[in-house]
């Protein structure tokens, strides 16, 4: 009996996987597997051309659901979702991902990048794939030249189609070769369990209050228009949102070259300009450039039929450290909120019109940014519990380094950031008060340390 089943698929869906993720991509009504390539152990790679009428062999399906046979794929989450979409919900524990194995070994996650790093050459991922995926696996824009069709099929370029099948075959070859090269570097049981947990978390997803997200974006659209009109009225620019036009205007007003309108540069420009029309425009620019608002757009794009966003974490996504990385909405990078009456504010922004909202909370974009966390909700009759380990990195590093004085801090008052800053700058710890501007600035330096 074979021990391993190596799999790769090429698929079609009208959903943009880069913006919506694999879960929503696979649940699209037009999702289908176009090509299936697979191999048992070191056996020959078999290619099934599903789009041209071939069917998946029963021997493959039997192996797919056999708990004794390991399923191997590069980025196995995708293949697992693909087969679940066509009725084969293979348990996570049966899947093994060569991308995760690569990440564990300090290599890139992408199949092409790993192929290059390991010098797989002819056995590596083919460079032709990106263009072929765009041609066969994505919708195309109807034109007179393509006879107004919205999708390409093999009949539209048989040579490319054969090349696409070879590309899929090579992905199986590359995945299998990576496994052979890294066979002596077993993922520890603890990390394997973490991977399975990661997949369970991604499968479960998180419930999104879409009504709230939709209204938030509607409010932001009105706010952006109003702020833009205010900037236009003051500056007389044709397009005050254009960085070049605005930099030129600011340069003329301030009699100096303005090189950047980056978010962290604007407060410096405001301080340099002082009170007046320039500061007014720069403050409007800050209000109009809250990039975090785009997270509401990401919610809309990736939420699935069950009202949840799935696939928000990438196991071993950070190079070198192997930490989890965020995907799609980027849950690990959410704006803080400092709103005193959070529930009340949220209620107003969920149901209110712009006139009502802006009258109560004039800085609409800032408030919307602070409300992003509240778009994630519990399902009915459940509680959404939010927990965080206090200064967890500082605690673990102190313990690993056997740094006694830091562990003593945690065993007493626990103010590690203040204690670090005290040692750095020779300031008594009791004088570092985070409620004051100076104390907060000093404490933040201790936090970095």
Regions found by a protein language model. Give the residues of each.
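Conserved "right-hand" nucleotidyltransferase catalytic core of DNA-directed polymerases
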Residues: 1-11, 15-17, 35, 117, ...
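Cytochrome P450 catalytic domain signature, combining two hallmark sequence patches
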Residues: 90-92, 255-261, 343, 401-412
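Metal-dependent catalytic core segments for phosphate chemistry
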Residues: 23, 30-32, 393-427
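Conserved, non-catalytic sequence blocks in retroelement Pol enzymes and Pol-derived host proteins
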Residues: 104, 387, 408-412
């Amino acid at each position: 009996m074979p021990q391993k089943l190596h799999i790769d698929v090429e698929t079609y869906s009208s959903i943009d996987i880069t913006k919506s993720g694999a879960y929503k991509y696979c649940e699209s009504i037009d999702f289908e597997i176009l090509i299936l390539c697979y191999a048992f152990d070191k056996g020959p790679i078999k290619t099934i051309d599903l789009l041209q009428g071939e069917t998946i062999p029963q021997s493959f399906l039997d192996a797919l659901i056999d708990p004794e046979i390991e399923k191997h794929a590069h980025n196995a989450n995708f293949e697992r979702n693909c087969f679940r979409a066509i009725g084969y919900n293979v348990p996570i524990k049966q899947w093994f991902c060569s991308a995760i194995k690569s990440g564990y070994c300090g290599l890139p996650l992408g199949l092409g990048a790993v192929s290059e790093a390991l010098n797989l050459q002819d056995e590596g991922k083919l460079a032709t794939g990106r263009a072929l995926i765009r041609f066969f696996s994505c919708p195309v824009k109807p034109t007179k030249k393509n006879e107004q069709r919205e999708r390409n099929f093999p009949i539209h370029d048989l040579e490319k189609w054969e090349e696409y099948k070879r590309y899929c075959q090579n992905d199986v070859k590359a995945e299998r070769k990576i496994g052979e090269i890294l066979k002596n570097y077993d993922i520890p049981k603890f990390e394997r369990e973490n991977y399975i947990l990661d997949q369970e978390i991604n499968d479960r997803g998180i419930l999104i209050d879409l009504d709230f997200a939709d209204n938030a974006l509607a409010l932001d659209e009105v706010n952006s228009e109003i702020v833009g009109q205010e900037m236009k009225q003051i500056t007389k620019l044709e397009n005050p949102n254009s960085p070049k036009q605005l930099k030129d205007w600011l340069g003329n007003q301030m009699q100096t070259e303005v090189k950047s309108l980056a978010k962290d540069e604007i407060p410096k420009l405001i301080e340099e300009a002082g009170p007046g029309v320039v500061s007014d425009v720069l403050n409007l620019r800050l209000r109009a450039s809250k990039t975090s608002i785009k997270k509401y757009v990401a919610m809309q794009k990736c939420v699935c039929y069950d009202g949840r966003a799935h696939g928000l974490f990438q196991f071993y996504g950070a190079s070198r450290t192997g930490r989890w990385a965020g995907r799609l909405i980027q849950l690990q990078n959410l704006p803080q909120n400092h709103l005193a009456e959070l529930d009340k504010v949220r209620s107003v922004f969920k149901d209110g019109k712009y006139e009502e909202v802006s009258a109560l909370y004039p800085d609409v974009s800032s408030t919307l940014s602070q409300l992003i966390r509240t778009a994630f909700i519990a399902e009915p009759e459940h509680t959404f519990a939010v927990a965080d380990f206090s200064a967890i990195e500082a605690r673990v590093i102190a313990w690993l380094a056997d740094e006694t004085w830091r562990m003593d801090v945690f065993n007493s008052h626990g103010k590690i950031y203040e204690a670090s800053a005290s040692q750095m700058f020779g300031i008594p710890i009791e004088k570092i008060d985070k409620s004051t501007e100076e104390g907060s600035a000093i404490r933040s330096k201790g936090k970095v340390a």
